[in-house]
Amino acid sequence: LYQRGEPSYDEANAGAMRYLPQRIARKLGETIEQSYGEREGAFLRALLLGDKKYLDEEDASNLSEVGLSHVMAVSGLHCCFLASLIGALMGGRQRKLRCAVTIPLVFLYAFVTGLTPSILRACIMISMGMIAPLLGRDNDSPTSISFALLLILLKNPFAIASISLQLSFSAVAGIIFLTPRLTALARGKHKLLRAAMLSFSTTLGAMVFSTPLACYYFGTLSIVSLLSNLLCLWLVSIVFALGLVSVIVAAAVPQLGAFCALLPALGIRAVLSIAGLLEALPFHAVYFNTAFSVAWLVYVYAIFIACALAKRGKYRYFAAVGLSAASLFAAAKVNALHYERGGLNVVALDVGQGESVLLISEGHAALVDCGSKNSYIDAGAIAADYLRSAGATLDSVVLTHYHEDHANGLAALFARMSASTIYLADIDAGEGDRAGVEA
């Protein structure tokens, strides 16, 4: 949680109780690696532990593009999955016993996965939700989320700068504010319709306050995120439950690992396939690297706020959706026309300490270098976002040398688009790892 101060050193003991969460995380990761295939294991590792470094570039890009990247970042959603799994396994046991089992396990999971502000928020809210009935009190969500924020900031006020905290609390605030109003519309309807409406309204509620923050920090808004979450979130919850059980069983009895992995692996492949199909749709995402996209987002929020304030007109929200879609197409077309009809546009992309320069003319583009030394900057994603928002085709990539600050973004770039020609500089071996780039 962004702790500050002078570092201190003491004698280490790998078997100490304080390192139990790390040992559990390592054991779970090793068991996943032994029981699952490379692709499925990488996804499950990201889902259960938040460890995304093993994910294939294309899979990670697809999940991010369609609005499913939150399943790879352990958060309150995963705590809810775990609490639901424990409740299902315990059945109709006494409420006190469920509370005594669930709360410690949820907090242990939080420590295993790194105790980020978002997961700590969920642990506090789940604990309050389970303890309140035992004390004869009603669980009040606004009180729970406020108390969670107070505890986190009392421990470390600098946590307010955490993107994880900002997105988590804004998403839950949206769910508390909007979701009950939307689910009420399906009251008295068919059970299947109510379930679909609950999933839709929860996703929409989570987006209403968090979307501006996500667009500001990550520069992307997935237009198909409502659809992707409706199709995949229930499946992800099943994969989480079956995957966690399979890993625990495989850790105890390694011979059963491959068998226990069969069903979760099928679910993982289904989620990745759906993400790949949705990513291939045109206009599946908006990229906030131009003034047109920013103006469009402001316009969308303005018309929906106007609809909420009007309180009249049965079809006003349908009209707002239509206007939002029409204005999106208009903004995208106007932005693309600038690159289709103008002369040569030279764009130095902001990749921190590195180089990435786009040359765009008449809808065609060449990219000179694609890399950054800053670990938090994905040069390939930045280039791909700009090309898609410009509606340009990448014809060629030119590498002037092979150091990471000029070439480490290529994998992410080619996970999202291809280039017909790649020009490699014929220079000394000291100018980076050419063999690694060619691979």
List the model feature ranges, each with a label.
Residues 75, 210, 401:
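Conserved G/P- and acidic residue-centered "switch" motifs that form tight phosphate/ATP-binding loops
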Residues 1-123, 130, 396, 415:
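Aromatic-rich juxtamembrane segments at the membrane interface
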